[in-house]
A protein has these predicted regions:
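Alpha-helical repeat/alpha-solenoid scaffolds of the HEAT/ARM/MIF4G superfamily
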Residues: 1-88
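Helix-loop junctions that connect tandem helical modules in alpha-solenoid scaffolds
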Residues: 2-10, 40-53, 96-111, 124-127, ...
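Hydrophobic residues within the alpha-helices of tandem HEAT/HEAT-like
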Residues: 22-26, 58-69, 114-128, 142-147, ...
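Alpha-helix boundary/capping segments in eukaryotic regulatory proteins
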Residues: 30, 69, 73, 105-115, ...
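Hydrophobic core segments within long, regular secondary-structure runs in both alpha-
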Residues: 34-42, 59-62, 87-101, 118-121, ...
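C-terminal low-complexity, acidic/polar tails when present
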Residues: 49, 70-104, 109, 119-125
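Alpha-helix N-cap/helix-start motif at coil-to-helix transitions, marked by capping-box chemistry
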Residues: 56, 88-91, 111, 115, ...
Length: 160
């Protein structure tokens, strides 16, 4: 086993390179990207590939391509994608994650799913601004989750 330590600047450069690569691949084939990410999410939901790391990686990938799906058009190819494609993908993805919070066991697992929902939603501000009803649903679900108690994470507002 070899342990590699990256400096923060190296980590940031790697993050940006991966993000640009995902954006480029998404622009090449939006539909294929959507299918791959949806299939990966389905394997998270059915438990066959469930892990915090897998879910975090997938949700980071979805957040990193924010706005890319709705800006894709090939003049000589058959692909034409508008904002509806990104909207459909994002709504379905978040709905699946919200469903996962209902069916998954364990508060820590639920916390991981909820934090990933917050991350993805935070990466698509233009979408949320245009779809208030969807934003309201997500925010209500997150507040519902926040009212649950988590051992070791409670903060008292009253001094002892």
């Amino acid at each position: 086993m070899i342990r590699e330590v990256l400096k923060e600047s190296d980590t940031r450069a790697l993050y940006l390179s991966l993000q640009e690569c995902l954006k480029a691949l998404t622009k090449l084939d939006v539909i294929d990207t959507e299918v791959i990410m949806t299939d990966k999410l389905a394997r998270q939901v059915d438990g066959s590939e469930w892990s915090w790391s897998n879910l975090n990686t997938l949700c980071w990938a979805v957040g990193s391509i924010a706005g890319t799906m709705s800006n894709t058009c090939l003049v000589f190819g058959s692909q034409f994608v508008d904002e509806e494609t990104e909207k459909r993908f994002l709504v379905n993805f978040i709905k699946e994650l919200l469903g996962l919070t209902e069916m998954i066991r364990g508060k820590d697992n639920k916390a991981v799913v909820a934090s990933n929902i917050m991350y993805i939603v935070g990466q698509y501000p233009r979408f949320l601004k245009a779809h208030w009803k969807f934003l309201k649903t997500v925010v209500n679900k997150l507040f519902e989750f926040m009212h649950e108690t988590h051992e070791g994470h409670s903060i008292s507002i009253y001094p002892c």
